[in-house]
């Protein structure tokens, strides 16, 4: 039996995003999500997480969108006080100690709402940066949580055997889940990253990935899993 986690990123980004994720959970394949702690829809996401307890919720660590929770992290922000664009972060021009403090603050904020994280991942996959490997090791140990798999040599405490990020843009196809069994060999655990949402003005303002989120939601709520695949949580 193939064990499948369908994780919706960006919980908390906007209220429309939050509602899309909840719809994808109630009426579709979404069984896990990760919450952004520095976004306009964060408080709304917390409320929904407490209401829909069957949805596994982790923390979507942020380093490339919005403002940091801490004020004393100069290597993480541009002159406007916002996080750097992801291109800057991927160049490795961040102080790992500041990243660790900021990500710790994000996790602690999540915990302050009485929520328990199922796992950690990150916005734009920045937790895969080699210079942040030790940071991830410490966070995983401190909070006793698994972390989304990156490339094999950079995986830190992964839960899944495989991670697919290709249900995105042109990869959002009607038969994606039908063909999934052909891609997975044996009894493996697979995580698929998804981004369902309903469009609202805040989403249009904050993300370049908009229209395909609605298509994702439709496919996630209309698709059925092939025999031999079961949904599991972190």
From Swiss-Prot:
EC number from the UniProt entry: 3.5.1.-
GO biological process terms on file: polysaccharide catabolic process
Binding-site positions, Mg(2+): 60, 123
Requisite cofactors: Mg(2+)
Keyword annotations from UniProtKB, A to Z: Carbohydrate metabolism, Hydrolase, Magnesium, Metal-binding
GO MF entry, a single one: deacetylase activity
This protein's record includes keyword RNA-binding: no
InterPro entries from the UniProt entry: COD_ChbG_bac, Glyco_hydro/deAcase_b/a-brl, YdjC-like
One protein family per Pfam: YdjC
HAMAP family: COD
Similarity annotation: Belongs to the YdjC deacetylase family.
Role description: Probably catalyzes the deacetylation of acetylated carbohydrates an important step in the degradation of oligosaccharides.
Protein name as catalogued: Carbohydrate deacetylase
Source species of the chain: Bacillus anthracis
Source organism phylogeny: Bacteria, Bacillati, Bacillota, Bacilli, Bacillales
């Amino acid at each position: 039996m193939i064990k499948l986690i369908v994780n919706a990123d960006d919980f908390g980004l906007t209220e429309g995003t939050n509602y899309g994720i909840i719809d994808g959970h109630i009426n579709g394949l979404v069984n896990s999500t990760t919450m952004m702690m520095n976004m306009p829809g964060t408080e709304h996401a917390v409320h929904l997480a407490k209401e829909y307890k069957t949805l596994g919720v982790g923390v979507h660590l942020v380093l490339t969108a919005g403002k940091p929770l801490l004020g004393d992290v100069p290597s993480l922000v541009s002159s406007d006080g916002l996080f750097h664009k992801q291109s800057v972060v991927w160049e490795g021009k961040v102080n790992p100690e500041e990243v660790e403090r900021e990500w710790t603050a994000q996790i602690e904020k999540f915990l302050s709402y009485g929520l328990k994280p199922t796992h950690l991942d990150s916005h734009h996959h920045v937790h895969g940066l080699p210079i942040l490997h030790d940071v991830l090791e410490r966070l995983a140990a401190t909070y006793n949580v698994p972390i989304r798999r990156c490339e094999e040599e950079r995986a830190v405490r992964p839960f899944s055997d495989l991670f697919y990020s290709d249900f995105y843009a042109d990869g959002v196809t009607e038969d994606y889940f039908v063909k999934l069994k052909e891609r997975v060999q044996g009894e493996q655990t697979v995580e698929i990253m998804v981004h369902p949402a309903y469009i609202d003005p805040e989403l249009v303002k904050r993300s370049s990935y908009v229209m395909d989120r609605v298509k994702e939601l439709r496919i996630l709520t209309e698709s059925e899993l092939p025999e031999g695949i079961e949904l599991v949580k972190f």
